[in-house]
UniProtKB/Swiss-Prot annotation:
Belongs to the bacterial ribosomal protein bL27 family. GO terms for molecular function: structural constituent of ribosome. This is Large ribosomal subunit protein bL27. It comes from Dechloromonas aromatica (strain RCB). The lineage of its organism: Bacteria, Pseudomonadati, Pseudomonadota, Betaproteobacteria, Rhodocyclales. InterPro entries: Ribosomal_bL27, Ribosomal_bL27_CS. Keywords: Ribonucleoprotein, Ribosomal protein. GO terms for biological process: translation. Pfam families: Ribosomal_L27 (PF01016). One of its GO terms (cellular component) is cytosolic large ribosomal subunit.
Length: 87
């Protein structure tokens, strides 16, 4: 009789999808209202003038303009602001 051993089973082979976090638009770049600037977990970057913060802490542009990153306050928070384009 021909016999074939049972194939082994593996307990590996699973991995979660990458979350694609990080800075999406950099300082000096021109953005349109609604463009995503930073995707993050928690407020690594804080919203400044003309920047909104979503419920998942995503920072996005509220007006068209140029992005500016700066460090402010005693806590040295990284703040993202948008200098509006001249209308």
């Amino acid at each position: 009789m021909a016999h074939k051993k049972a194939g082994g089973s593996s307990r590996n082979g699973r991995d979660s999808q990458a979350q694609r976090l990080g800075v999406k638009r950099y300082g000096g770049q021109f953005v349109l209202a609604g463009n995503i600037i930073v995707r993050q977990r928690g407020t690594e970057f804080h919203p400044g003038d003309n920047v909104g913060c979503g419920k998942d802490h995503t920072l996005f542009a509220l007006k068209d303009g140029v992005i500016q990153f700066s460090i402010k306050g005693l806590k040295k928070r990284r703040v993202v602001t948008i200098v509006p384009a001249a209308e």
